[in-house]
């Protein structure tokens, strides 16, 4: 399966901006009323579209690559990307190792 590995750094960005970036990328669980209610806020990457083998590295399916790059450019994140071939099983299990 064709995929893209994206390496990025958030070293030059503020911590709160990095948090917002990750929330938009992966989504979050928002709790209200002291944790009584939970709402899932979805990100641009659905669950089976990416794998994070280590911090600051994402392996994404080809169809989501441009969305990730557009988000990184909007936040001023430095990144590099390479096209790779991977087994489709890593996206099903969401584990690389």
Model-derived regions, located:
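Generic "edge-of-domain/loop-turn" microfeature
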Residues: 12-15, 65-67, 86
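Short, low-order "capping/linker" segments at domain edges
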Residues: 92-97
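Conserved short beta-strand edge segments in small beta-sheet-based binding/regulatory domains
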Residues: 76-90
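Acidic, metal/ion-handling microdomains and their immediate structural contexts
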Residues: 25
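Short S/T/G/P-rich N-terminal loop/turn motif that feeds into the first structured element of a domain
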Residues: 1-21
């Amino acid at each position: 399966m064709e995929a893209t590995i994206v390496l990025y750094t958030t070293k030059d960005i503020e911590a709160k901006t990095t948090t917002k970036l990750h929330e938009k990328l992966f989504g979050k669980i928002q709790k209200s009323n002291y944790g009584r209610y939970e709402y899932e806020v979805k990100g641009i990457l659905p669950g089976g579209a990416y794998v994070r083998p280590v911090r600051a590295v994402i392996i994404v399916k080809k169809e989501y690559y441009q969305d990730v790059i557009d988000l990184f450019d909007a936040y001023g994140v430095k990144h590099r990307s390479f096209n790779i071939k991977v087994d489709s099983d890593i996206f099903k299990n969401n584990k690389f190792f």
